[in-house]
A protein has these predicted regions:
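Non-transmembrane, aqueous-exposed alpha-helical and coiled segments at domain scale
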Residues: 2-453
Length: 453
């Protein structure tokens, strides 16, 4: 790329070593000054940094005056996620729009409120004239998340009142972004697929009478066709990813950036940058790729001993990416169980049966059962380990024929709702910029003139 240097030269390599030499910290100092690395204690529990009413993530209970692990639970505005998803399934209806209303406004809508709100979102589900051509199709990104961030920041220029942080204006902006995130994500992928992978280009308009999940599948597929089961399970997947407390990295980023008084587009773009990180939103891609490697290495998928041996090789950095991790296992908060994974699993088997993927499902189930045992045998752990939401979400997306490049953007399509609820909460309740402290651990230096160095 002319004019923009993209190669790491020997000079840059040398400067990197200089930077490392003078920047690396003695890790023993964290304990000395009682600094919680990653803002978490030794058990993974986060440092209390704020208050919220948006959602509650629970993984412990008090027994005989002591805090002990329990089955994980997740509630949105006080409503258990299992009850919410069960209600949508039993009524055979979609829930994304209803849960969006719940998270933003704090209560479940009645029929009229839901109809009006769904129509409001549908009416805003369009992009500025020529936005797809002039923004999304120009210089498409190799990573859809970066393209999504660029699109969000560019929408600032199309907003006639972008910097107004009054609550009605911020709510308007949030609802607009919630409505168009599916378009930005799918169209971003279509541009990538055409200009970078040299595939045919399909741009389908959304239909107002369809739900978010239905429109995603319609816009993504060349023939615009999908089954009712596919759309329902994608709807459930989106609901499970919509919100997860104020302390997860991208939502905390939303709080931090919102506290500065900046505009909505900048705050959401910052959250997207956080979510892109493989330690946050990209984990389900790792799970799928790990299983792809496992299927090549394990000859008999039904042989527990062979699967167990592969899992041990993962932990010993002898398989897959050699990072020593079994992806999809363990969570910063949950230890006994991740309620989102439990909800997912209830529908995964049904979809696997429809898609002819029962052999894959059996392997996933075996790994879910064996991995905690292997980790307990091979590692010193401070709490239990169980499958997290990423363990099954990648498998679900693969059965829905979603390309890997869209896995994290689908996370964003869901989590924009949670970010919006937390941005509103921050603006309504907080009046101070978030500004924690860092302890300096370097001794003072005496200045030396240039000609004496």
């Amino acid at each position: 790329m002319a004019g923009f240097k993209t190669k790491v030269t020997p000079e840059i390599e040398n400067l990197t070593e200089v930077c490392k030499e003078h920047t690396s910290l003695d890790i023993s100092l964290y304990a000395k000054y009682d600094v919680k690395r990653g803002l978490r204690d030794i058990n993974g529990k986060g440092v209390l940094a704020g208050l919220t009413q948006v959602s509650n993530v629970k993984a412990t209970k008090i027994v005989d005056g002591k805090e002990v692990p329990c089955a994980g639970s997740l509630s949105y505005r006080g409503y258990d996620i299992k009850d919410l998803t069960r209600g949508f399934i039993e009524d055979d209806r979609y829930g994304f729009e209803e849960v969006t209303y719940l998270l933003l406004f704090g209560s479940l809508p009645d029929k009229k409120q839901l109809t009006d709100f769904t129509q409001l979102l549908a009416n805003q589900r369009s992009l500025p004239t020529n936005f797809v051509r002039d923004v999304i199709m120009k210089a498409p990104s190799k990573d859809i998340m970066n393209g999504l961030s660029r699109s969000v920041l560019t929408l600032y220029s199309y907003d006639t009142n972008p910097d107004d942080t009054s609550l009605p204006n911020v709510l308007r902006q949030c609802l607009n972004l919630i409505s168009v995130f599916p378009l930005l994500s799918v169209y971003g992928y279509q541009a990538y697929n055409h200009y970078i992978k040299d595939k045919s280009l399909y741009i389908h308009n959304p239909k107002k009478e369809l739900t978010t999940a239905e429109n995603i599948l319609r816009m993504l597929r060349p023939d615009k066709k999908y089954s009712h089961l596919e759309a329902k399970i994608l709807d459930i997947a989106l609901i499970l990813h919509m919100e997860h407390g104020g302390g997860n990295n991208s939502t905390f980023t939303t709080h931090v950036v919102s506290s500065s008084g900046t505009d909505t587009y900048s705050a959401i773009a910052a959250a997207l940058g956080s979510l892109k990180g493989p330690k946050h939103g990209g984990a389900n891609i790792k799970v799928v790729r790990m299983f792809d490697d496992m299927k090549k290495e394990v000859k008999d998928w039904k042989d527990e001993d062979e699967v167990r041996t592969y899992l041990k090789r993962l932990l010993h950095k002898e398989a897959f990416d050699r990072k020593g991790l079994i992806y999809g296992m363990g969570h910063a908060i949950y230890s006994v169980s991740d309620p989102r994974a439990e909800v997912f699993k209830a529908y995964v088997e049904t979809l696997a049966r429809e898609k002819g993927r029962m052999k894959d499902y059996a392997l996933y189930s075996m790994v879910e059962r064996l991995a905690p045992e292997v980790i307990a045998e091979e590692r010193r752990i401070y709490k239990g380990v169980s499958a997290n939401v990423d363990f099954y979400s990648g498998f679900v997306y693969s059965m829905l024929d979603l390309p890997l490049e869209l896995y994290t953007p689908m996370f964003a399509v869901a989590r924009i709702v949670g970010w919006s609820a937390h941005r509103m909460e921050e603006l309504i309740n907080a009046d101070k910029i978030i500004r924690p402290a860092y302890k300096n651990v370097l001794e003072p230096a005496v200045y030396v003139p240039l000609n004496e160095r």
